[in-house]
From Swiss-Prot:
Subunit structure: Part of the 50S ribosomal subunit; part of the 5S rRNA/L5/L18/L25 subcomplex. Contacts the 5S rRNA. Binds to the 5S rRNA independently of L5 and L18.
Cysteine pairings via disulfide bonds: none
Gene Ontology cellular component annotations, sorted alphabetically: cytosolic large ribosomal subunit
Protein name according to UniProt: Large ribosomal subunit protein bL25
Highest rank taxon of the organism: Bacteria
Length: 240
């Protein structure tokens, strides 16, 4: 079940960069609510409260009830911008959610059981191939994250999307067979296997010339013997 949090907002009558900068100087963050075939609503939010929500994690998969002068808007964040140097929020876009809405969300992947994995115990490493999963979900069933259990994975084993049980009302957007997590071997393991194969190939290659050398030697021994056997017979015919 999706988490729903409360945020208080104030109306922002003016738009534009100048008005947005004025809001930030006043300790507020400009934002907009759009969607559900209704006109956009420009608002501003308390900077401190918004920061807490963003940095608490799972911001883009959290539902919010935004209270604007007593009117409630049920929304989900779709995008936000942070200052590249100081990391404070600059702007947020909220999508208004209608009754029974279904939306696409990018949900983070959480891995559990790595310390129990036989492959990890043998020196392997858990490699997260996809850190997020694109899902289509009913708004009341948006998962905060997708959990993947790797406790039984051997080296070179993987977990695919169709191996994971998704919550009710949730289905994948991309192919179900996509790889989520794999256990990769330690760096030296592949080189050792290659070295063993190279040594076996070299031994087989050395055996082949030796066998070839033995064959001409046998042929050379037979040829003089045959010539010696024929020579006296030829000489005897001449004396007659």
């Amino acid at each position: 079940m999706a988490t729903v949090k409360e945020l208080k907002a104030t109306a922002r009558p003016k738009a534009g960069k100048g008005a947005a900068r004025a809001e930030r100087r006043a300790g507020r963050v400009p934002a907009v609510i759009y969607g559900d075939n209704k006109p956009p609503v420009t608002i501003s939010l308390d900077d401190k409260a918004l920061r807490q929500s963003i940095f608490a994690g799972h911001f883009l998969t959290t539902l919010f009830n935004i209270d604007l002068d007593g009117q409630k808007y049920r929304v989900i964040p779709r995008d936000y911008a942070l200052d590249p140097v100081k990391d404070f929020p600059l702007h947020v876009d909220f999508l208004r959610l209608g009754e029974g809405a279904t939306i696409r969300v990018s949900v983070p992947l959480h891995v559990k059981g790595a310390e129990l994995s036989p492959g990890v115990k043998r020196g392997g490493t858990v490699n997260i191939v996809n850190h997020t999963v694109e899902l289509e979900a009913e708004v009341d069933h948006i998962p905060q994250f997708i959990e993947v259990d790797v406790s039984k994975l051997e080296i070179n084993n993987s977990v695919h999307l169709n191996d994971v049980a998704l919550p009710k009302g949730v289905k994948p957007v991309l192919r179900e067979g996509m790889t989520l997590v794999t256990v990769v071997p330690p760096s030296g393991m592949g080189e050792e296997a290659k070295g063993g194969a190279d040594a076996a190939a070299a031994a087989a290659g050395a055996a082949a010339p030796a066998a070839g050398a033995a064959a001409p030697a046998a042929g050379a021994a037979k040829a003089p013997a045959a010539a010696a056997a024929k020579a006296p017979a030829a000489g005897g015919d001449k004396k007659k």
